[in-house]
Amino acid sequence: MLVPKRVKHRKVQRGHMRGEAKGGKTVTFGEFGLQALDSHWISNRQIEAARIAMTRYMKRGGKVWIKIFPQLSYTSKGVGVRMGNGKGAPEGWVAPVKRGKVMFEVGGVSEEVAREALRLAGHKLPVRTKIVQREEVGGQSNEK
């Protein structure tokens, strides 16, 4: 699973995810991509589940690019613990994904296989998604 090797701060504040993604909105490596239509935290387990779903459907043919990384820790306190007494222990790792971000890319397989693999991966994620295709000239993604 994806986890950072080393972090500067073990516990981080949640913050807000407002607006659209600034970068990473186009398909750059493969021919097809999976774009987020909502903003959400995506855990390392969800990223791994989506990756496994894609590679199994493609029967290990082609190539998958994961363009998000779970860099923030999230914390939670125990079940029977009262309020106060500091922040809870780190539970896992999440990748903040804003709307418009291309999270996964696929290349080296036919269009039907790529679309179905990305559709299966989208079902593993907590955001609404759409499949975008790389444009030949401008490199911009469009919905097909």
Swiss-Prot record:
Residues 1-16 have a biased composition (Basic residues). Keywords: Ribonucleoprotein, Ribosomal protein, RNA-binding, rRNA-binding, tRNA-binding. It holds the Pfam family Ribosomal_L16. It comes from the Bacteria. GO terms for molecular function: rRNA binding; structural constituent of ribosome; tRNA binding. One of its GO terms (biological process) is translation. The keyword tRNA-binding applies. PROSITE patterns: RIBOSOMAL_L16_1, RIBOSOMAL_L16_2. Gene3D superfamilies: Ribosomal protein L10e/L16. Residues 1-20 are annotated as: Disordered. GO terms for cellular component: cytosolic large ribosomal subunit. The keyword S-adenosyl-L-methionine does not apply. Belongs to the universal ribosomal protein uL16 family. NCBIfam families: rplP_bact. Part of the 50S ribosomal subunit. Binds 23S rRNA and is also seen to make contacts with the A and possibly P site tRNAs. This is Large ribosomal subunit protein uL16. It comes from Limosilactobacillus reuteri (strain DSM 20016).
